[in-house]
């Protein structure tokens, strides 16, 4: 780990909004490198502090933690609503884009708890290379599962590794007409990447927000084969 000092910059008087274009803030040097080993996670803490004459120091600092992990997410981890489809055999799909080839190992979903667990239904977890035309890479039946704790996602392990590149989609096929009530985040709007199909073709969603499904990449999967013993 290392620390990068961006220095200081004087903001012109009477400036109420806008972006600071000071190069050390705008384009900081990368001086902390990833390990030569296979790291799955890395995080950086970015801190900005504003000082002024007579400033009390209260509320003068903005801190952001930038995480690099093994999953993609449009949501912020907190559901404000639930998403589902009201027609049997309907499908929903979220589009993602990879910058480099990687291996999909698992998919996480958050399901809202409901009265009498009404959404505890079976569904098909799906992965597509394309939805128009449909090119299905994975389809397997699972049951809605709740994970103990506040807003904890359930992780579905894929029984086969899927090597992906460029654009791909993850989603579900709903076997019944009961709403699965997948967590839906209103705070972050990624509606342009969410599509649904109730049997008459794919359409973009009309709802502003993000479906709480996440693809997980790159972890080593157990093979079930014992390690070979060295020859003597």
Which residues does each PLM region occupy?
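Coil residues (strongly favoring Ser/Thr
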Residues: 2, 60-61, 103, 160
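Short, aromatic- and glycine-rich surface loops/edge beta-strands on solvent-exposed regions
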Residues: 32-64, 168-172
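A short beta-strand element within beta-rich, extracytoplasmic domains
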Residues: 102-115, 172
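Aromatic- and Gly/Pro-enriched, solvent-exposed loop/edge beta-strand patches characteristic
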Residues: 117-192
């Amino acid at each position: 780990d290392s620390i990068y000092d961006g220095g200081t910059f004087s903001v012109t008087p009477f400036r109420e909004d806008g972006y600071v274009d000071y190069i050390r803030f705008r384009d900081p040097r990368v001086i902390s490198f990833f390990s030569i080993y296979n790291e799955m996670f890395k995080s950086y803490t970015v801190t900005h502090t504003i000082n002024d004459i007579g400033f009390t120091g209260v509320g003068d600092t903005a801190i952001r933690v930038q995480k690099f992990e093994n999953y993609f997410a449009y949501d912020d981890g907190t559901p404000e609503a639930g998403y589902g489809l009201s027609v049997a055999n309907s499908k929903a799909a979220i589009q993602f884009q990879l910058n480099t080839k990687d291996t999909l190992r698992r998919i996480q979903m958050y399901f809202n708890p409901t009265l009498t667990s009404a959404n505890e239904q079976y569904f098909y977890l799906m992965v597509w290379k394309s939805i128009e035309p449909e090119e299905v890479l994975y389809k397997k039946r699972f049951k809605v599962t709740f994970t103990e704790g506040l807003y904890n996602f359930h992780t579905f392990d894929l029984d086969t590794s899927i090597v992906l590149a460029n654009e791909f989609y993850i989603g579900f096929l709903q076997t019944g007409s009961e709403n699965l009530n997948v967590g839906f985040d209103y705070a972050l709007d990624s509606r342009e990447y969410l599509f649904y199909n109730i049997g008459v073709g794919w359409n973009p969603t009309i709802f502003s927000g993000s479906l709480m499904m996440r693809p997980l990449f790159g972890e080593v999967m157990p093979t079930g084969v014992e390690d070979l013993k060295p020859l003597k």
